[in-house]
């Protein structure tokens, strides 16, 4: 091989090594698009994106990201679907069951990264049953087995369209003391709690109070020492934003979705509660018409310190697909004040998750026995 060819080969090798190395480096603080407060690495059959592929998907567009799987496993029942193996909960009538191994998988995946790469992720514990009084024991065991890894719990589900009724065993409830134990322990440790609970039943009629709203507010008020993020602002695929009926002649018009959330934000007893605007279904509602966009922009500009953007993507395969939900919000991003936009896309994530990291590490230092060099357990 001549000298020129050798130099060319070395140059290509150096470039390839640089590309791999840069995939794990965070984007510069001033030029990435967002931090992702709501991301699933794996799906309903526990398959997903390799963490290094996800780093490449993040690239220089995403600064940091939560990291969790799906706490529920879809059963493949031959009696129900034959040779077809469902990968999503809508593809089968067979039940879902809690899959606790997801937490070990997420921890091992995170620990496979270099310390610099780990800085970009905030793993979350999800593999517990919120209707089980022993759920707290699971969370504690995960923290003891994997100290230095987890920042929060969730996304875990209480009420969810099409899902809640499929879960094997007891039905989760906002009034279950098991859930109070979970949130109280999260507050003790400093773990952020990301909770999915629909605000209402599917296809609710206009001018009717949301079925689960008062229970949710009561739960949140019972745990002022826990940082809680209400996923999707309580919305779902067929759990539509709460609406006041146009032209209603009722004596007092019921508030709409944004007014309900705004009232919660203004409630001094709920200062510890935040809302994520993740999921493409939520984005569809937010940009449904120019009039709705106007209201959403005004709401987000006024309350940007309590909102976080997240994708709610599950096991993405490309950067283009992963960024699609972010760009669905472009009509809103363009009209937000620079401060509001930065808060929702980036700053609130950093503020909340950095604080949680610090609190959880301090709790672990105090409560998790330090292994000695000869400890082979």
What is each residue range found by the language model?
Residues 12-23:
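Bacterial N-terminal signal peptides
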Residues 2-13:
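Bacterial N-terminal signal peptides that target proteins for export
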Residues 167-308:
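Catalytic pocket-lining loop regions of alpha/beta-barrel enzymes
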Residues 4, 28-37, 46, 50-65, ...:
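Mid-to-C-terminal alpha-helical segments outside catalytic/metal-binding sites
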Residues 40-42, 70-71, 126-130, 156-159, ...:
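Active-site beta-loop-alpha junctions enriched in small/polar residues
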Residues 35-39, 65-68, 121-125, 152-154, ...:
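Hydrophobic faces of well-ordered beta-strands that scaffold small-molecule active sites
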Residues 29-108, 114:
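An N-terminally biased module of ancient metal coordination in phosphate/nucleic-acid-related enzymes
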Residues 32, 81-201, 205-208:
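Active-site gating/metal-coordination segments in enzymes
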């Amino acid at each position: 091989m001549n000298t020129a060819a050798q130099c060319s080969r070395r140059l290509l090798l150096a470039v390839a090594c640089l590309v791999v190395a840069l995939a794990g480096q965070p984007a510069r603080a001033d030029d990435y698009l967002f931090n992702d407060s709501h991301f699933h690495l794996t799906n309903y059959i526990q398959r997903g994106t390799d963490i290094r592929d996800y780093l490449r998907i993040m690239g220089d567009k995403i600064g940091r990201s939560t990291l969790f799987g799906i706490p529920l496993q879809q059963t493949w029942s031959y009696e129900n679907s034959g040779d077809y193996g469902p990968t999503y909960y809508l593809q089968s009538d067979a039940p879902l069951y809690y899959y606790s191994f997801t937490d070990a998988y997420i921890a091992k995946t995170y620990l496979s990264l270099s310390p610099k790469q780990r800085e970009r992720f905030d793993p979350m514990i999800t593999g517990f049953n919120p209707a089980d009084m022993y759920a707290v024991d699971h969370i504690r065991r995960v923290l003891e087995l994997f100290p230095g890894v987890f920042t929060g719990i969730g996304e875990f589900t209480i009420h969810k369209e099409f899902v809640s009724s499929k879960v094997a065993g007891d039905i989760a409830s906002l009034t279950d003391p098991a859930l109070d134990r979970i949130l109280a322990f999260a507050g003790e440790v400093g773990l952020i709690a990301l909770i999915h609970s629909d605000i209402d039943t599917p296809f609710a009629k206009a001018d009717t109070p949301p079925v689960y709203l008062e229970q949710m507010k009561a739960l949140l008020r019972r745990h002022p020492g826990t940082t809680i993020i209400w996923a999707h602002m309580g919305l779902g695929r067929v759990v539509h934003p709460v609406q006041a009926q146009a032209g209603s002649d009722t004596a007092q018009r019921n508030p709409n979705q944004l007014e309900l959330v705004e009232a919660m934000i203004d409630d001094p007893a709920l200062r510890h509660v935040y809302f994520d605007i993740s999921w493409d279904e939520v984005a569809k509602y937010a940009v449904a018409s120019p009039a709705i966009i106007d209201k959403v922009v005004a709401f987000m500009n006024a309350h940007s310190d309590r909102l976080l953007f997240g994708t709610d993507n599950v096991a993405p395969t490309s950067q283009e697909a992963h960024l699609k939900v972010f760009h669905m919000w472009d009509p809103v991003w363009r009209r937000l004040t620079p401060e509001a936009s930065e808060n929702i896309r980036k700053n609130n994530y950093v503020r909340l998750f950095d604080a949680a990291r610090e609190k959880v590490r301090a709790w672990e230092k105090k409560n998790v026995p330090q292994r000695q060099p000869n400890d082979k357990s």
